[in-house]
Amino acid sequence: MLIIPAIDLKDGACVRLRQGLMEDATVFSDDPVAMAAKWVDGGCRRLHLVDLNGAFEGKPVNGEVVTAIARRYPDLPIQIGGGIRSLETIEHYVRAGVSYVIIGTKAVKQPEFVGEACRAFPGKVIVGLDAKDGFVATDGWAEVSEVQVIDLARRFEADGVSAIVYTDISKDGMMQGCNVEATAALANATRIPVIASGGIHNLGDIQKLLDARTPGIIGAITGRAIYEGTLDVAEAQALCDNFKA
């Protein structure tokens, strides 16, 4: 399992939100490229970038920062989400050197777009499913749908999606522990690999994900915990590497 540091971009700065609320943002750095360097130096093997402005505006806003990070670390797998709602945007990021694009809102509202994207950019597409009480949320979490997460995930199996980033909104940015049960249930219900997101606070939370013994969980995204120092990237990755399932 990979430990994947998150860099959330708002107005060119690196921030963290609590429960997806744009008005509840903590700025951790005004130099996201330097922040990426910190996590790379700390031993991370993959980065998770989010264009928060893009998620709310429906188009890339912090694209220059994303490109700068991708060009600085051409051998590091980077995944980007936020405002990805067209094939043109995906092409822009792929050309910039990004390894994976995460389709969120559009995957829920127009599921057929995921198939189009997978055909145009095979192996490059991740679906981001954000949930509240098992139901999918969209538009920067502003709307909660009547669609069950597991039902939607199964729909994408035939498309060739590389992974699902699963976020429990009630946990995100609160550092109260990951929703292991829901994450494992999703991973067991679909053939698509799952990346856990939201609520990871410390090594104990990583251990709980490992203890779920769910091969389908291939990574864990962490944000506030690594910024506030309750989790060390290298230590967490070592725990994963040494875990015997």
UniProtKB/Swiss-Prot annotation:
The UniProt record lists the keyword tRNA-binding: no
Transmembrane segments: none
SUPFAM superfamilies (alphabetical): Ribulose-phoshate binding barrel
Keywords: Amino-acid biosynthesis, Cytoplasm, Histidine biosynthesis, Isomerase
Pathway where this protein functions: Amino-acid biosynthesis; L-histidine biosynthesis; L-histidine from 5-phospho-alpha-D-ribose 1-diphosphate: step 4/9
GO biological process terms held by the UniProt record: L-histidine biosynthetic process; L-tryptophan biosynthetic process
Pfam families according to UniProt: His_biosynth
A GO cellular-component term linked to this record: cytoplasm
Reaction equation(s) it catalyzes: 1-(5-phospho-beta-D-ribosyl)-5-[(5-phospho-beta-D-ribosylamino)methylideneamino]imidazole-4-carboxamide = 5-[(5-phospho-1-deoxy-D-ribulos-1-ylimino)methylamino]-1-(5-phospho-beta-D-ribosyl)imidazole-4-carboxamide
EC number(s) on file: 5.3.1.16
Localization (cell): Cytoplasm
Matching Gene3D superfamilies: Aldolase class I
Superkingdom of origin: Bacteria
Molecular function terms, GO-annotated: 1-(5-phosphoribosyl)-5-[(5-phosphoribosylamino)methylideneamino]imidazole-4-carboxamide isomerase activity
Catalytic residues identified in the record: D8 (proton acceptor), D130 (proton donor)
PANTHER family assigned: 1-(5-PHOSPHORIBOSYL)-5-[(5-PHOSPHORIBOSYLAMINO)METHYLIDENEAMINO] IMIDAZOLE-4-CARBOXAMIDE ISOMERASE
Family indicated by similarity: Belongs to the HisA/HisF family.
Name of the protein in question: 1-(5-phosphoribosyl)-5-[(5-phosphoribosylamino)methylideneamino] imidazole-4-carboxamide isomerase
Name of encoding gene: hisA
